[in-house]
Amino acid sequence: HRLLLERQIPHEWEVRSGGHDFACWNTALPKAFRFINEYFNGKQSGNSESSLPNETPFIQTANATVYYPEQAQGSTRKYPIIYVQGEINEQQQKVLVSQFHQMVDENKTWPAVLSFVKANTDLSETISDIEKQLSGIRGSQRMRALITLGDNIKEGIEAIQRENLFTGIVCVNAIGNENDAQNLIKAVNSHKRYPRCWIEILPESKEYGFSSNIHILLKESDLEHEFRSRKCKEANVFTYWEDWILYLNNRIHV
């Protein structure tokens, strides 16, 4: 490292504890592959401050804002995509994207495209438009997941009813009636590789009964899912953002 530094040769240097332990090598691999991939694409980051990644690239479409992973710059690689539908302003989006990229940098999860879809818009149509118009997206059921907030679960239900779009779904403070709950179960249960569900109820939610009903119906149908009812009031609805990302990305990469 000192010789490379003295000769001003671009490189990366990182000290890890663990020696020859497999876990040490395994956690180092993602960054090693990224380094090699950047070299192939003629983009070598090295240790210099001037070569640090630029601001996260994003694309604005009619009904969504799409953020690409930092690793996508200068690369032809295609990535899985996680859709998030609800009332989320631009500042909040950037905070969530930054948290996600930090998780990737810390090797907690894998890179993915994040697409924030406007509330109460046709989800299926929006997905179709995004994946036809934009490159760098692995548009398949196994590589696609959804986080839905409040009454936007109805858009998610319609999307699943039309076709099996998602490998995993996180429903946060879902709002609906008994028919919506029944429709969700029918939609999920109609696919052999059904989307796994994470049901999240935060203390401020006034629709505890609806989410509980979904949980009971999923359990009665013997469908694998997660159910979280939080007791402590948190600062904002995205306190458990990392939990949701890990759940969905693990579903994508099983």
Regions found by a protein language model. Give the residues of each.
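Non-catalytic cap/lid and distal C-terminal segments of serine-dependent acyl enzymes
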Residues: H1-V254
